[in-house]
C-alpha cells in the first residue's frame, strides 16, 4: 500500500472502530418515571423535588453489580434562579402557592363582577403577571411565558383552586405547555456533582462581591447600572423624525430585536452547558468522543441530542372532524394507549395527555384500530420501549467514554422531528454555552466553515449565536485509536475467536444509533501513529490471502501481523531497517521537542512576550538536529559500516524517498549541457544510427572545395566528422521574403568538367558524398549553408550572413573556420560571356556576368566568339 492509500485508511479509521466492553463496566440505570409511578401506587403522598434529588432516597439500582455513580436529576430548570440561595434548594420545601393579601376573602374569590381578583383590578395584575421577573436576574430565558391566547379571556377565578388543606393555588402553575414535542430524556448527575457545583457557585458569587480583589478591570467587566429617573425629573423625549423626511419606521420584529439587544443581563449562575448533536452519520460520533475526552471539566453539563425522522403518513385526509373525533375516542378507549400516553410525559412542560398525535399506521380506521391493538405506538411509528432502549444505549456509551475523574451531569435526549427544529428547541431550553459539531473537511488548506453553504455545521457557525467547536473527523484517528487501546478485546475472547491473523479494524454490524464498539489494533504501545504509519502499514496486495478470505467483506485490511506490516519496496523505501531507524529517530526527536515545549510553557522565568519565540527556537532546533541525524545515516553508509549490498539497498531506499518527496523527480541529478531556445529538440532516445544519419546528411550539404585545395577538403571532412547534431538554419535580419530559394546561399556549381584528374582527386576525398548526392540534369546542386548550434559543445559556430540586393549578385559566407574559405578565381577577358556586356560605345569596359543563372556551362565559353581590341578590331 502506498502512502496515499495508507493515509486514507487512517483518516477513515473512525468508521471501523469498535469498543469491547465488559458487562460490569456498564452503568446500570433506572427508569425514574416508572419508579415514581410505583411509589405513587404504594403511597399517595406527594413527593417533593428535594426528596427526588436526595441521594439517600428510596431509588435504588437493581442487580448484583449495581453502581450508584450517577443519580437521577432534572434535565433543566423551569423556575428562574435569581439569587445565590434559592428557597427551592432547601430540602423538604414545598411550593407555598400564589401569595394573596390577607384581606382577601372567599366571597371575593367567587365574585366575578367585583373584588380583588376581578378582571379590572390593575393592582393584582401588576403584582402577579405571567411575565413578572425580578431585577438583576442572572438567568435569562428561564422566565414564565405569557398565557396562551386560548386562556387570555378566561376569568381569573377559574385559574385557581382550593386544595385539601385550604390553600389557594393556581391550577396552571408554573406555565401552560409552550414546547410540545415528542422526546424522551435521561438525565443523570455524578454522585458528588451537586456538592461540587454548589461550592463553585458560592466561589463565583464571592468573586463577584469582591470584584476589585479578583479582577484587574472590574469597571469594564461589570459596568454600573444606570439609575432610573426620579418621579419629579422631566422624562427624556425621544426624537421621532417625520415619515416625509425619509425616515422608515421600524417593524415589530425590528423593535423586538432592538429591545432584546439593548437589554442588559447578568452572568448566568448555571453550570457550563455543552450541547452535542449526533445522528446516523458516523463522523458525528467523533465530535462526541472529542467533547467527552477533551473538552469537559468538573461541574459541566453535557447534553447529547439525537433526532429521528417522523414516519407519519400525510397522504390521507384529516379534514373530517368526525374521523378526528373517532381517532381520539379510539385512543381513549384503549387502556394501553392511555398508559402509554402517561409514560410519554418526558418534559415537565408537557403534562397534558390530551395532546393530539395522529396515528401513522394507515388511512383506514379499521386498520388503525386492528393494528393499534397489537402495536402500542408512542409517536410517529415508534414504540416507547424501542426509544427507551436506544436512549439507554446512548447513556451507557457516554458514561463509558467519560474519564473516571470527571464529575459531570449527563443529559441524553432523543427527539422526533427535523434537525433544525430540534436544535432550536434544545438551544431555547438548555441555553448551551458551547456547541460541538463535526465535519468531513480535513485538509489544512481547506476552510472548515463556508459562509454560503447549507450544511449543518456551516449554519451553526454562521447563523446561530453560540460558540461552536468544529471537529475534523478525519484528523481524529489518534483519539479513536487511543479509545481502541483502552477498550480492547479481552485476551480470552481473542484466543477463542482467532484462528489466524485478524485485522484490527472492522466494520460495525449495525447501522443504527447504537453503541459503536472498537477492536484492538495490533501495534506497539510506544508507536506514534503519525510517523509510524510509514513503518507499519499493510501491503497493497497482501501476503496472507487465507486470512483475508476468512474475514468478512466489510472488514478493513488495515493492519496485519509483524511479517506483513512492511510496505512494498517501491512504495517508500527498499530496506526495513532504514525505515525503522528513521521512525525511531523521528519519534525520539518529537518526544524531546514536546518535552521542551512543555517545559517552556511552565517556565515562569520566561517573559510572556518571549515564550512564543522560545517555542519557535525549540522547533527549529529540533528540525535541524533531525536533519543532521538523517545525514549521519548516509555517512555511515559511505564510510563502509555496512556491506556493499546493504549499502546499495539503503542508498536506493533514500533515493526512492527523495523521489516520493519531490513528486517523481529523478533520484540523482544528472548534469546536462545548457540548451538554447534556438536548438532543435532532439529525441532523448536517439540511437547511434540517427547520429550517423545526421552526420551523413550534414556532409551531403557541405561546401565542395576546389580540386587544387586538398588541405581545405581534409579540414572540412574532419569538421563534419566531429559534428553530431543537426544544425538549424539562421538567416540574417537583412534577408527578404521575396528572395525565395535564392536566400539559401550560393548555388553556383563548383564542379569543373575540364580536368578529369581533378574530378578523380575530388572523388578520392569525397567518395561518400558523390554516391549519396542526388544529381538531376538541368538543375543546380545546392550550396552548403552553415548554421548556429549551441549544442556543439566547445565549438564556436557563427551565424551565416546573407546579403541581398535588388538583383542577387554575390553571396558571402562568414565561417569561423578560415580553412573553409575558398578563393574565387579572377575573371579575365578570356572568360567573358556574350551576355556579360552589350555593344556600343562602352563595350570595351570589362565586367562580370550579371546573370545569376548557373545553367551556362564553362565549356560553352570556349566555343563562344570573343571580342577583340578597340572598336572590334582584333589584337595586333
Swiss-Prot record:
Sites of Phosphoserine modification: 48, 51, 360, 510, 552, 577, 775
Composition skew (Basic residues), residue ranges: 689-699
Gene name, Swiss-Prot/TrEMBL: JIP4
UniProt-listed PANTHER family: SERINE/ARGININE REGULATED NUCLEAR MATRIX PROTEIN, SERINE_ARGININE REPETITIVE MATRIX PROTEIN 1
Record-level GO cellular component terms: spliceosomal complex
Comp. bias intervals (Basic and acidic residues): 37-48
Disulfide cysteine pairs (residue numbers): none
GO biological process: regulation of mRNA splicing, via spliceosome
Highest taxon of the lineage: Eukaryota
Region (Disordered), start-end ranges: 37-67, 112-155, 226-254, 330-353, 490-513, 661-728, 750-876
InterPro entries according to UniProt: Ser/Arg_repetitive_matrix
Protein species of origin: Saccharomyces cerevisiae (strain ATCC 204508 / S288c) (Baker's yeast)
Compositionally biased residues, Low complexity: 49-58, 717-726, 794-808, 842-854
Regions of compositional bias (Polar residues) in chain numbering: 115-131
Descriptive protein name: Uncharacterized protein JIP4
MF terms in GO: RNA binding
Keywords (A to Z) from UniProt: Phosphoprotein
